[in-house]
Amino acid sequence: ALMYALEKNLDRVGVRLTYIHQSKDEKLIKNYVFSRAELEEKVASYLESYLAFYAIIMRRIEKRNETAGTLSFPFLNFRKWQRELAKYAYGIAKNGGTLFAEAPTGIGKTISTLYPFVRSFSDGVNEKIFYLTAKNSGKEAALQAVELMKSKGVKLSEVLVTAKDKICFCPGKACNPDECPFAKDYYTKIRDVLTKSLARYDTFDSSRVSRIAAAHHICPFELQLDLSLYVDVIICDYNYLFDPLVYFR
């Protein structure tokens, strides 16, 4: 409305908001009239809130990139073949491409691939790391590797994405405010929840996500998806890349 008022040089603008019921053939129409000054004041307040939020995100990114450049391999020595794997992974992280690697259990594949990608943050080439796995043990190994690198000084944030049926507070109910109380007012609350959570924490596993969601009475599944937009490392099932119904966009 403000953009239209500015474009047409209008002092007042009429706005119509139409709500459509999901399951009934019903509409709720609300009409408003705003002065240009009112619109400017409202938009300025919204922008101020968004800018404060993104200032937190940008400070985290700057600190992440700065500390990633000085991160050493988190163990005193490389195991056999770890150095070679890390070298090839770093080349992919910087230049793109695909690396297929097959190695026995126990060689240290997780840290050998995650470490070079974390280091690449300092070059400004990559914005986010997805770690995909089919097993919960793989998720835990990735989470432990990230925590190990953080203990060595790099400033990272990560979310471990949990399947909806395992984290949902209201299993069996449809994901809409009419059936699930944790969906009600979700988008009214989420900006404040994200701002406080990202300022306070850098690790978001299922237990922490559930505690935050319960404290604010919001959906934990949607919360972890919204957190994934702003963290550095996303650890999740490979379906979130390959399944067209649920994949991250």
Predicted regions and their residues:
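Well-ordered alpha-helical segments embedded in enzymatic catalytic cores
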Residues: W81-Y88, S112-P116, D237-Y240
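Charged, low-complexity
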Residues: A37-L71
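A substrate-engagement module of RecA-like helicase motors
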Residues: N65-A68, S72, V125-I234, N239-F242
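Short, conserved "post-DEAD/DEAH" coupling segment immediately C-terminal to helicase motif II
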Residues: V246-F248
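Conserved pre-motif I regulatory segment
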Residues: R59-E102
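Nucleic-acid nuclease catalytic cores
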Residues: A1-L39
